[in-house]
From Swiss-Prot:
It holds the Pfam family DNA_topoisoIV. Residues 445-447 are annotated as: Interaction with DNA. Its EC number is 5.6.2.2. ATP binds at residues 183, 212, 240-242, 253-260, 478-480. It comes from Dictyostelium discoideum (Social amoeba). It catalyses: ATP-dependent breakage, passage and rejoining of double-stranded DNA. Residues 810-1232 form the Topo IIA-type catalytic domain. This is DNA topoisomerase 2, mitochondrial. The gene is top2mt. InterPro entries: DNA_Topoisomerase_II, HATPase_C_sf, Ribosomal_Su5_D2-typ_SF, Ribsml_uS5_D2-typ_fold_subgr, Topo_IIA, Topo_IIA-like_dom_sf, Topo_IIA_A/C_ab, Topo_IIA_A_a_sf. The active site is at residue 900.
Length: 1284
């Protein structure tokens, strides 16, 4: 025995096993479990299965011990009877074949019937009811020899698709079929000339035949085993050609079981093969579960006969406990499995019972579309599937994928490794799915940052199809349902191209699908959260700011009104008014600021929002109820809601947000008249205690004012009510005494549903943009009516808030300023702010002078930003920062309190905004006072100099900064009628990095260099702040890319020293500067959204920087013409005034006109007589021309004063002559030259060449071809560093 165990000869070992056959025949039938002990030596054939031997010894016990165990059965007791059992009854020996039959689970899976979800064809050719094979295509009729069944040929072409059913089948039976099928497909890898696989399934004869051409098994004797190779690999376990693991193969077979398992579980198994190289044809039959074999029949091949292999077997149905292949769903699964083979092996002609399965991978995948798109109603005919249903990509010759949407609510994967159907997926599927989920997740985060979405939520919406080739694949078991090979051992790296992922996201709308699912989940969470709300009869004492109606939550709940006020001051007004109508049916609840826009927000945010929770509780609302019946309305604590907000734009927005909240969750409430509003006057004109006029809109007041004269207007006292807090308690009682005049009911109207969604849904911004541009802004609400439709509220009132919000957020093309900035500049000019003032004091002055109503804190922030001068902020700040205004360390957020810092106008401000233009501006009016102009007229487009960022309603703007010197040069060329040759490139004052074109935008790169053994970073890309960048470096430390870093940063400069160990240094030395920039995230794109207001206050979305300059140029040149006209007219008046004054003083000094002791009227009469020399035409002038003469002092008659006035006159005439001889272009050119000289003297930065573009070595992501040129070695090194 020892000799046999140490002998590698397979035949000797087999003979030894036969030696114990007598013992095996006497085994006790009570044996229920088998413990396996290997007696094969280490040099014997090894297998990846749990069975590694050719002889088996079993022990009758229930232990899981791998080796010997004597664990007793539950009911056994230690006794003499137990211990005296025959040793032969305990220990048994099995041959490998017997062990396969005894324990099939370890080899082919269970041989018991199971029920599971499996993919099958919609119109199988196997008709179980009729027991016929129905071929749908012409000329493919197949006869099945049987006296009880027939083959039917049908002319109808039903829709063919693959869908899941609850299939009943035997996994082991499917597996033995699949083993032969995969072997046939594997042969294509061995012989590229192989062209077909033909499968014949005859269920009535219990016969399956699989044939393929191409080189098969050599018909030669195996010198070691002394038998034909065909017999060895088809009739002996653990034999085959796939045991050399040093050789990489992309086939399905690995362990030497394969076809032998099919043989063992068949009553009859035959192999027929032609070996053209040896000129022989081989035929051999096995029967009785491979127990009996016939001698091989070898004949010479005929002329023209080619290589092929044909396996025919009849499964042992008794072993599988079925009577026929027609039983259950096994035939449908075998059929679909052949479709898999056809889809994965495009170059092969695959046929089943003579019917060709003509599919490639794409057309195969589309067979699943009907189910994945949840299509339950389709016409019963062939359908051309939409190409955009799936995105396909051949990542490499080894990897083909299809990505689609799964509308079934769960992740769907269909995958194949070397033609093996990995039913449960594995590492290959996970590797690809993770890439898709990661990409989609990043896009979702950008578009729906407020939604809580986990990677698994995205994965549940995916359908992923994979057909790949993997070197020497490893599986979880012999059934090969799950690939376990590590990605690094695949033999290739399947990185999905970003272009394919982008196309999938665009065409599949997966972003919208996942976001929609998340919103539905939020609603479900809300339903759950409100299911335990207090009953309507319970007073809600926990909400401290609620003044509850006495009847709320009682039998008279539907008679109650909840007044929602804008803040506490409005609540006080409401409570004062309730003293008139009583507290039984009215409750009051103040909102803190604006209500949350409940659309497109995470459920967590909704559930944690105190205002939303309070309103829901106070009103007794339930997310389970739709409130579509009178009966359901009785569950509410209040019968209606009355909004009491300010009559300004923000008040309209608050109304809209309350409306949106109710519409989003309970639209039926709006349809049932649940919402009303309480309106108050915004202006009151009082003439006497009995003569008062109230106006609910500014437009109403302006219309009234146009109907009366200025003298009549002076008889009125005008009072502006900017907030409800302005009204007195007496006025509140007046309002509530006449509720009909102040309460307006909202009613449903056509398009109400769509308009409310349009106004508040984030994904409808394009519609909002068009709505804002196309709506007539002259329209307004008539507050004399008693009812307003929701569409009218949206189109005539809320639109004004949207417009005002855009005015606050979107800059002017002409001066580059937003209203807040313009107010600050106006107040600074008005105050002549050349001396420092505290920022907090300036903001107070601005609010006072410009009627600013949004809080001084907002002004403080704007003032600080207008004074920022660090890299990435302003190229030309208009205010001076004196103190800590913030630095590039934290992007300006590190500024000191407004109480401690000072500012004043920068000298350059008046170079840019020439004082001569001030009289030409159109100054706005508010509360009867003149405030800032609608826009200033700088001499260069400040929109490009300092850039702008802003988000409005339905639109946003993002404009980079450009060099003022470049802009001046461009304007100079235009003024000289020359074409600008250079294209403007973004420029940031003090920036040391590079800026280069990148598709439709520009990319900014920082600076990193290898200095000695360290890396030094001396600049960051625009928009990345020093403190924030340390997170990037810490992440690289965690990934062992760098050792550590040191900081030498200042408030104005960047200097990081990166410390490296020897290994890291070696890796860095092999990277180019571009690759270092990419690795250290020193590159960022500049956003270009060129949205702004033009000179007519129309929103424009421009396409290029040059278009901004063009429009600015036209407007600015017109204003230089206006300036010239104004100056000439002004100088004419000054010349006339000076001339008259000089003449008047001269006649007095000469004694021609005596003024002593005379009345003013007498002097005027003498001057108008024309009798005084030099004043002949005095009487022709209007009085305002000479009224100033009578306010002159006695000192003005002196010679010195007359000489001074004469010099002024000469100067004014010279100026008049100069301007008369000039044109608008020359005036503008002079201003530009003056500005350029000032800039070049004030800062050396402006003396440098501003058009700094990237060098040839800079990293440019727009150049995909450049990226492709990276060598595979270098790229792999970079990826390796990053992946660590």
């Amino acid at each position: 025995m020892s000799k046999l165990l140490n002998n590698n000869n397979h035949k000797n070992l087999t003979n030894y096993l036969k030696f114990g056959k007598g013992i095996i025949n006497n085994l006790n039938n009570k044996s229920k479990q088998v413990g396996i002990i290997s007696f094969i030596s280490q040099s014997s054939i090894q297998s990846q299965s749990s069975i590694q031997s050719q002889s088996f010894l079993s022990i009758n016990n229930n232990s899981n011990n791998k080796y010997f165990s004597t664990k007793l059965n539950k009911n056994e007791k230690i006794s003499e009877k137990t211990t005296t059992r025959k040793i032969e009854d305990i220990y048994q020996k099995k041959t490998p074949t017997e062990h396969v039959l005894l324990r099939p689970d370890s080899y082919i899976g269970t041989i018991e019937k199971i029920e599971d979800d499996m993919w099958v064809l919609s119109n199988s050719m196997f008709n179980k009811e009729k027991k016929t094979i129905e071929l749908n295509n012409d000329n493919n009729e197949k006869n099945v020899e049987s006296t009880t069944t027939t083959t039917t040929k049908t002319n109808k072409k039903p829709l063919t698709y693959i869908h899941p059913i609850k299939a009943t089948y035997i996994p082991g039976l499917l597996k033995i079929y699949d083993e032969i099928l995969v072997n046939a497909a594997d042969n294509k890898k061995r012989d590229s000339k192989m062209s077909f696989i033909k499968v014949e399934i005859n269920p009535n004869e219990n016969s399956i035949s699989i044939m393929n051409d191409g080189k098969g098994i050599p018909v030669v004797m195996h010198q070691t085993e002394n038998c034909y190779v065909v017999e060895m690999v088809m009739g002996n376990l653990m034999s085959g050609s796939n045991f050399n693991d040093s050789e990489l193969k992309v086939v399905g077979g690995r362990n030497g079981f394969g076809a032998k398992l099919t043989n063992i579980f068949s009553k009859e198994f035959t192999v027929e093969t032609v070996d053209k190289s040896s000129g022989k044809k081989y035929f051999q039959r096995w029967s009785n579960n491979m127990g009996d074999r016939s001698e091989p029949i070898i004949t010479p091949i005929g002329e023209g006969e080619s290589d092929y292999t044909k396996i025919t077997f009849k499964p042992d149905l008794e072993k599988f406990k079925i009577k026929s292949l027609w039983d259950d769903n096994i035939l449908q699964l075998m059929e679909r499995r052949l479709y898999d083979i056809a889809g994965c092996n495009t170059e092969l002609m695959v046929t089943l019972n003579g019917k060709r399965l003509n599919y490639n991978f794409q057309s195969y995948v589309k067979l699943y579309e009907h189910h994945l798109n949840n299509s339950t109603k389709r016409e019963d005919n062939e359908e051309q599937y939409r190409e955009e249903s799936f995105e396909f990509g051949e990542i490499s010759p080894r990897w083909k994928i299809g990505i689609g949407l799964s509308e079934t609510g769960q992740f769907t994967q269909v995958s194949f490794v070397n033609s093996i159907n990995t039913v449960k997926g594995g590492t290959h599927v996970n590797f690809l799915a993770d890439q898709i989920v990661r990409y989609v997740g990043e896009k979702l985060k950008k578009k729906h940052s407020d939604l809580e979405i986990r990677p698994m939520n995205i994965k549940h919406h995916l359908a992923l199809f994979v057909n790949c080739l993997v070197d020497n694949p490893s599986f979880d078991s012999q059934s090969k349902e799950t690939l376990t090979t590590k990605p690094m051992l695949f033999g290739s790296t399947p990185e999905i191209p970003e272009s394919l992922l982008a196309q999938f996201v665009k065409n599949s709308k997966i972003i919208e699908r996942v976001a929609g699912w998340a919103l539905m989940k939020q609603k479900a969470d809300l339903i759950h959260s409100t299911s335990g709300r207090q009953s309507k009869t319970t007073l809600i004492k926990s909400i401290s700011k609620l003044d509850d109606a006495n009847w709320a939550g009682g039998l008279k709940s539907k008679e109650c009104t909840l007044i929602i006020t804008e803040g506490d001051s409005a609540k006080s007004l409401a409570l004062a008014g309730l003293s008139v109508v009583g507290r039984n049916s009215y409750g009051v609840f103040p909102l803190r600021g604006k209500l949350l826009n409940v659309r497109d927000v995470a459920s967590k945010q909704l559930l944690s929002n105190e205002e939303i929770n309070n309103l829901t509780t106070i009103l007794g609302l339930s997310h389970k109820n739709s409130y579509d019946t009178d009966e359901s309305m009785e569950d509410l604590r209040y019968g209606r809601v009355m909004i009491m907000a300010d009559q300004d734009h923000d008040g309209s927005h608050i109304k809209g947000l309350v409306m949106n909240f109710i519409h989003y969750f309970w639209p039926n409430l709006l349809k049932r008249g649940f919402l009303v509003e309480f309106v108050t006057p915004i202006i009151k004109a009082t003439k006497s205690s009995t003569q008062k006029k109230s106006f609910f809109t500014i437009k109403d007041y302006e219309k009234w004012r146009e109907t009366i004269s200025s003298d009549q207007l002076k008889q009125y006292t005008i009072k502006y009510y900017k907030g409800l807090g302005t009204s007195t308690s007496a006025e509140a009682k007046e309002y509530f005494s006449n509720l009909d005049k102040h309460v307006i009911k909202f009613i449903w109207g056509d398009e109400a549903d769509d308009l409310i969604k349009m106004a508040f849904a984030k994904d409808l911004s394009s519609l909002r943009q068009r709505w804002i541009k196309e709506t007539d802004m002259s329209q307004g609400i008539d507050h004399s009516i008693k009812e307003i439709t929701y569409p009218d509220f949206i189109n005539k009132e809320l639109i004004h808030y949207s417009w005002a919000a855009n005015l606050r957020s979107i800059p002017s093309l002409i001066d580059g300023l937003k209203p807040g900035q313009r107010k600050i500049l106006f107040a600074s000019f008005k105050r002549r702010l050349t001396n420092e003032i505290k920022v907090s004091q300036l903001s107070g002055y601005v609010a006072e002078q410009t009627s600013y109503h949004h809080g001084e804190q907002s002004l403080n922030s704007t003032i600080v930003k207008m004074a920022h001068n660090f890299v990435g902020s302003n190229n030309l700040p208009l205010l001076t920062p004196s103190g800590q205004f913030g630095t590039r360390l934290q992007g300006g957020s590190d500024s000191a309190s407004a109480r401690y810092i000072f500012t004043k106008l920068e000298p350059v401000a008046r170079y840019l905004f020439n004082e001569l233009d001030d009289p030409l501006l159109n100054y706005l009016e508010e509360e009867g006072e003149s405030i800032q102009p609608d826009y200033y007229i700088p001499i260069i487009p400040m929109l490009l100099v300092n850039g702008s960022e802003g988000i409005g309603v339905g639109m946003s703007t993002s404009i980079p900064l450009f060099s003022p010197i470049d802009i001046i040069d461009q304007l100079m060329l235009r003024l000289n009628n020359q074409v600008a040759l250079k294209k403007l490139i973004p420029w940031y004052r003090g920036f040391k990095g590079t800026i280069s074109p990148d598709r439709h935008t520009y990319r900014t790169n920082g600076v990193i260099k290898l200095v000695g053994r360290n890396l030094e970073i001396t600049e960051l890309p625009i928009g990345r702040w020093t403190s924030d960048y340390k997170e990037v470096l810490n992440d690289l430390i965690d990934k062992d890319v760098i050792k550590s870093f040191q900081e030498s940063n200042t408030e104005n400069s960047v200097h990081f020293t990166i410390l490296l160990n020897n290994n890291q240094l070696e890796q860095m030395e092999d990277l180019t500067e571009n690759e270092l920039i990419k690795l250290f995230k020193l590159s960022a794109s500049l956003n270009f959204h060129l949205t702004c207001f033009d000179e007519n206050s129309k929103i424009q979305k421009l396409e290029s920087v040059e278009e901004i300059i063009d429009q600015f140029y036209k407007v600015r040149l017109q204003f230089y013409g206006k300036r010239r006209e104004y100056l000439l007219k002004s100088l004419d008046n000054q010349i006339k005034r000076l001339t008259t004054t000089i003449q008047f003083l001269e006649v007095i000094a000469s004694g021609k006109l005596k003024i002593q002791g005379r009345s003013k009227q007498d002097l005027i009469k003498e001057l108008e007589s024309g009798e005084i020399v030099g004043f002949e035409n005095f009487g022709t002038h209007p009085p305002e021309v000479y009224q100033h003469l009578f306010s002159l002092s006695i000192l003005d008659i002196t010679k010195e004063r007359i000489d001074n006035l004469t010099n002024q006159l000469t100067k004014r005439k010279s100026e008049h002559q100069s301007i008369s001889s000039s044109d608008p272009k020359s005036l503008w050119t002079a201003d530009l030259q003056q500005l350029k000289e000032y800039l070049e003297k004030s800062d050396k930065e402006f003396q440098k060449k501003p058009l700094k573009t990237s060098s040839s070595s800079s990293f440019d992501v727009s150049s995909s071809s450049e990226s492709a040129k990276l060598s595979s070695t270098r790229k792999s090194k970079t990826d390796k560093i990053k992946s660590k």
